[in-house]
């Protein structure tokens, strides 16, 4: 029985997906199509978005890059246009500052409304010298309503899984209620959209097709990691995709000795240490 392997490869992480029809180790079975509820479809699409954002983070950001929350002064209320105008100006100022240093500015952001109706913005971006001072200056110049900001460094534990989940989280009913007071009704949906800079690496899977062996061996012995990587045991997931009937195996590998942004930008990407080679037994 043929199956497909899809590998999403980043410098410090590799995500592997195996898909095939039927039971593991046996000829495929045809399954009846099931009608799915709107809630099931919504949850499935949300998980797919989390995967997409997680892979974007893995492909473009490193441990010790920044996760920043920009806040407005207490009591500030703005519609979506006001949000976007302030944020666009902030990003433009930051981009210019990075450009003067000869550094490409990359980012992922999401505008959010707090439970008390306070607007704020979550942004992930690459680190460079003097970033904290840049943020303070750029935010004050971008908006007369600029308040405080919080800055944290990224932790690549679990392949940025928790970070991606937070960036993509759905608003609860309390927050949805606040939107009626904080924003124009027709603009609500835009608030929770994840946006990115155009210069991000967009990871595409490396696909492999196999017809000479089944998943029985890999299930019995367990998957084998790429040299220099370890398999995150908690990441191994098997099951059946309810939307296409394909049985799947998914897991993540993480580099044992992670490569830093400095190592990568100083030419590591052109050296063997940044390349991944893995043997597959047939």
Which stretches of residues belong to each language-model region?
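Right-hand nucleic-acid polymerase module
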Residues: 1-117, 127-282
């Amino acid at each position: 029985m043929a199956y497909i392997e899809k590998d999403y490869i980043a410098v410090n992480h590799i995500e592997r997906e195996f898909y095939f029809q039927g039971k593991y180790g046996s000829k495929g079975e045809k399954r009846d199509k099931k009608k799915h509820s709107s809630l099931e479809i919504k949850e499935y699409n949300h998980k797919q978005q989390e995967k997409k954002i997680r892979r974007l983070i893995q492909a473009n950001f490193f441990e010790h890059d920044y996760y920043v929350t920009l806040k407005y002064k207490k009591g500030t209320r703005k519609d979506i246009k006001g949000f976007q105008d302030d944020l666009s100006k902030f990003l433009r100022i930051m981009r210019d500052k990075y450009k003067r240093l000869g550094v490409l500015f990359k980012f992922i952001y999401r505008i959010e409304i707090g439970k008390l109706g306070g607007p704020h913005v979550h942004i992930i971006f690459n680190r460079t010298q003097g970033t904290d001072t840049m943020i303070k200056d750029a935010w004050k110049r971008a908006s007369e309503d600029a308040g405080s900001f919080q800055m944290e460094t990224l932790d690549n534990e679990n392949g940025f899984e928790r970070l991606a989940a937070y960036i993509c989280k759905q608003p609860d009913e309390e927050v949805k209620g606040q939107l009626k007071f904080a924003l124009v009704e027709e603009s609500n949906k835009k608030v929770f959209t994840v946006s990115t800079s155009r210069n991000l690496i967009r990871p595409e899977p490396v696909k492999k097709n196999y017809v000479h062996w089944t998943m029985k061996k890999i299930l019995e012995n367990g998957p084998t990691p790429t040299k220099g990587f370890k398999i995150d045991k908690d990441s191994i997931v098997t099951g059946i995709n309810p939307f296409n009937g394909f049985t799947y195996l998914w897991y993540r590998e993480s580099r044992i000795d992670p490569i830093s942004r400095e190592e990568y930008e100083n030419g590591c990407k052109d050296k063997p240490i940044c390349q991944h080679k893995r043997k597959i037994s047939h």
